């Protein structure tokens, strides 16, 4: 079964009991943040909480630990990744050069839909110099940013 890494989703199911009926539990370690919120920006697929929000619970690490605390066999947990990014445009009002501390005006122009960008498109545009690449060493999460437009994409 594929499940969200969000603790609020995990808590409503007794996975210690449910695991007996499952070969694996595919933990979706993505879609933590996105353009559905323009005032709460963050990593779409952070492994750990970022330094600017150390109490963030929407992380892969938190999801795995939450399942283990329920008594799930670690051999049943398979961490899934997305091959796309989520992003915003018009990011402004941020502090210390960190766009995630600001707010956005809407979703970034996407590949399939606004706010969602295919990984290949991100990689190709990085190679063409269209993005400023960054890596959050604390959260273990990459992102790209264009200061001129406030376009921000977080991906895994």
Stretches found by the model and what they are:
Residues 1-7, 74-77:
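Short beta-strand/loop segments at the ligand-binding rim of alpha/beta enzyme cores
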Residues 2-6, 30, 82-86:
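Active-site beta-loop-alpha junctions enriched in small/polar residues
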Residues 6-18:
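Distinct, well-ordered alpha-helical segments
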Residues 15, 19-22, 57-64, 119:
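Extracytoplasmic/secreted envelope proteins and their assembly/folding machinery
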Residues 16-21, 70-74, 136-138:
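Extracellular/periplasmic catalytic domains that process cell-envelope and extracellular macromolecules
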Residues 25, 79:
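Conserved, mostly hydrophobic/aromatic
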Residues 33-46, 81-156:
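Glycan-binding loop/region signatures in secreted carbohydrate-active enzymes
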Residues 35-77:
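P-loop/Walker A phosphate-binding loop and immediately adjacent motor/lid segment at beta-alpha junctions
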């Amino acid at each position: 079964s594929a499940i969200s890494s969000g603790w609020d989703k995990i808590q409503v199911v007794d996975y210690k009991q449910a695991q007996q009926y499952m070969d694996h539990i595919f933990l979706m370690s993505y879609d933590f943040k996105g353009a559905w919120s323009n005032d709460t920006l963050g990593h779409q697929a952070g492994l750990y909480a970022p330094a600017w929000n150390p109490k963030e619970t929407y992380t892969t690490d938190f999801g795995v630990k939450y399942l283990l605390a329920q008594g799930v066999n670690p051999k049943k947990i398979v961490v899934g990744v997305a091959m796309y990014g989520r992003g915003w445009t018009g990011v402004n009002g941020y502090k210390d050069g960190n766009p995630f501390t600001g707010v956005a005006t809407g979703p970034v122009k996407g590949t399939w839909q606004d706010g969602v960008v295919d990984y290949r498109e991100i990689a190709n545009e990085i190679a063409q110099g269209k993005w400023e690449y960054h890596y959050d060493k604390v959260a273990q999460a990459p992102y790209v940013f264009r200061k001129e437009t406030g376009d921000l994409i977080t991906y895994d």
